[in-house]
């Protein structure tokens, strides 16, 4: 804008100069050229000065207008900036207010949730307190019953003590009677000596030997009769007490008699699935069998396939894999391998759960995790079709009951009963008998000496160092001998009976042998003219030893030798 004013001023000055020149030319005739020229120059300078002044004024005015415009623009920009800053501050303040409002709402919701949680916790605590009160009440009732039982037990012990005192008094009386009889015999011997010296004319040494020989024979017979009577009486009382304890233990214990087979039948949605399980050129079934170690039998059975394996653990893993493959629908070697690894991991968790449940059911606490895992493995182990883990739990119950009746540590007895067959959990993976493996495992996990002794001698309790091995052996026999607890194939059962009879008949002097009571007893008839009563006892022990050495059988086999003498007389 100021530049435009300058240009206009210059144009006006030029126009004025041109006009002046023209005026000067028209007036040349009236004045001289010099004067006119000077006047024209003076006037031109005046006009130029006026134009320059006017231009300067216009420039100054334009500059002032520019400065005013810049100032107004800056003021407007400042006002706009201030307004924008105020809007920004207001927006930030509003955002902070919104954020604070959200925080307040969140805090209020959190407080409400905490209040609800506190109410729920209070209700749970009240319920837990009520449960604890009920548990305490039941414990008090159990304690009362236990006190009553202990009172009855104390009364029984007192009665037994009285009987023992009476028996001791009778024994003392019998001993005094024996001493009196010995004195009488001594007196009779002295009198007999005198008579023998007088009548027979024997020397004192010879007479003394004859009398002592006769007297020793009489005393030996009398002592044998008394010892036999006392032994029979003590044995009868011991058998009666043992029967009572075992009967109580059996009455208070009950368990399932189910058994596992060596095959599992897995249902499938349709027979078309069988072809997918086999796969192209049999690659799926080969991958399945190689990864699981289980035979997959696909036959004409409608909507079902069969898994066959002697190892129940592998068979269970294979069943889980097959169920997952059928449900998923994607069946190929890679997917089969993934499912096998997943099923094996799941099976480890399942095994640990089974071990924990067995320990809880048996009332045994404080087992180390590795030992619990080994217990869980026995869930998939069978002995004569009897589940070893269920058998161990039942042995633990029976051992605890009998130990309680005998005044022993019931908790320690249950622990020994539960652990007695722990070696069977890995006896197919490690060399050695399940007894040897169980002893090593118990020592490795720091089990008490009583538990180790029970594991070592639950098949030969007569060599055990503690009573717990005897109780575990008895409970083991009770659990195995229950009807339906164990079973075997008919062919092997008949073969075992025949082998029992053949072993017994092979001994000299045996006339006949019969396997009775489902093979748990062999009755041997001997020839009385070839086998004496003393030899019959030795023969029974020898036959039992040969059976233990040559045969495998569940439980125990009793050998009974029968010797019968017949005397026939004919009256004519």
Swiss-Prot record:
Which positions fall inside the KH domain?
Answer: 262-322
Question: Which segments carry the region annotation Disordered?
Answer: 59-85, 110-142
What molecular function terms (GO) are annotated for this protein? RNA binding; RNA endonuclease activity
Membrane topology for this entry? Single-pass membrane protein
Keyword flag Secreted: no
Q: Name one GO cellular component term.
A: plasma membrane
Q: Among the record's GO biological process terms, what is one?
A: mRNA catabolic process
Q: What parts of the sequence cross the membrane?
A: 1-21
- Which controlled-vocabulary keywords does the entry list? Cell membrane, Endonuclease, Hydrolase, Membrane, Nuclease, RNA-binding, Transmembrane, Transmembrane helix
Per the record, the major location class is: membrane
* Keyword Kinase in annotation: no
Q: Which Gene3D superfamilies match?
A: Hypothetical protein af1432 (1.10.3210.10)
Q: Which family does it belong to?
A: Belongs to the RNase Y family.
**Function recorded in the entry:** Endoribonuclease that initiates mRNA decay.
HAMAP family named among the record's database cross-references? RNase_Y (MF_00335)
Q: What is this protein called?
A: Ribonuclease Y
Which gene name belongs to this protein?
rny
């Amino acid at each position: 804008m100021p530049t435009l004013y300058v240009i206009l001023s210059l144009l006006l000055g030029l126009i004025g100069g041109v006009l002046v020149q023209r005026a000067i030319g028209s007036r040349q005739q009236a004045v001289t050229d010099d004067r006119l020229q000077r006047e024209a120059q003076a006037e031109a300078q005046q006009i130029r000065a006026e134009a320059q002044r006017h231009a300067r004024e216009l420039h100054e005015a334009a500059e002032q207008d520019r400065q005013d415009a810049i100032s107004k623009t800056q003021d407007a920009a400042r006002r706009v900036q201030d307004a924008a800053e105020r809007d920004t501050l207001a927006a930030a303040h509003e955002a902070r207010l919104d954020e604070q409002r959200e925080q307040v709402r969140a805090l209020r919701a959190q407080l409400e949730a905490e209040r609800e949680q506190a109410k729920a916790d209070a209700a749970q605590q009240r319920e837990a307190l009520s449960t604890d009160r009920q548990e305490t009440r039941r414990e008090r009732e159990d304690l009362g019953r236990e006190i009553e039982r202990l009172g009855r037990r104390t009364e029984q012990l007192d009665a037994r003590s009285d009987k023992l005192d009476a028996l001791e008094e009778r024994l003392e009386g019998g001993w005094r009677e024996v001493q009196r009889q010995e004195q009488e015999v001594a007196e009779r011997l002295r009198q007999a000596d005198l008579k023998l010296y007088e009548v027979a004319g024997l020397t004192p040494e010879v007479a003394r030997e004859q009398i002592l020989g006769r007297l020793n024979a009489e005393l030996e017979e009398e002592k044998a009769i008394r010892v036999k009577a006392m032994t029979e009486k003590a044995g009868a009382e011991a058998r009666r007490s043992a029967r009572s304890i075992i009967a109580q233990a059996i009455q208070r214990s009950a368990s399932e008699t189910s058994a596992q087979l060596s095959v599992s039948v897995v249902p499938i949605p349709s027979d078309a699935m069988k072809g997918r399980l086999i796969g192209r050129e049999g690659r799926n079934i080969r991958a399945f069998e190689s990864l699981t170690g289980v035979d997959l039998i696909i036959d004409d059975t409608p909507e079902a396939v069969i898994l066959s394996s002697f190892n129940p653990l592998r068979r269970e893993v294979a069943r889980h894999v097959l169920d997952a493959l059928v449900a998923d629908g994607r069946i190929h070697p890679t997917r089969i391998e993934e499912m096998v690894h997943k099923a094996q991991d799941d099976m480890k968790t399942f095994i640990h759960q089974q071990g924990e449940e067995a320990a809880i059911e048996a009332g045994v606490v404080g087992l180390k995790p590795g030992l619990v895992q080994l217990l869980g493995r026995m869930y998939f182990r069978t002995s004569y079709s009897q589940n070893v883990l269920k058998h161990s739990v039942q042995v633990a119950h029976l051992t605890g009951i009998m130990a309680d009746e005998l005044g022993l540590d019931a908790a320690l007895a249950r622990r020994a009963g539960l652990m007695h067959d722990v070696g069977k959990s890995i006896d197919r993976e490690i060399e050695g008998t399940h007894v040897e493996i169980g002893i090593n495992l118990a020592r490795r996990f720091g089990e008490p000496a009583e538990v180790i002794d029970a594991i070592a001698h639950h098949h030969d309790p007569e060599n055990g160092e503690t009573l717990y091995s005897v109780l575990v052996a008895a409970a083991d026999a009770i659990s195995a001998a229950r009807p339906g607890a164990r079973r075997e194939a008919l062919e092997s059962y008949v073969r075992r009976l025949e082998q029992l009879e053949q072993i017994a008949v092979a001994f000299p002097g045996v006339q006949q042998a019969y396997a009775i009571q489902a093979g748990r007893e062999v009755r041997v008839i001997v020839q009385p003219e070839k086998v004496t009563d003393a030899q019959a006892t030795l023969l029974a022990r020898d036959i039992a030893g040969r059976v233990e050495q040559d045969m495998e059988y569940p439980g125990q086999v009793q050998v009974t030798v029968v010797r019968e003498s017949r005397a026939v007389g004919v009256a004519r």
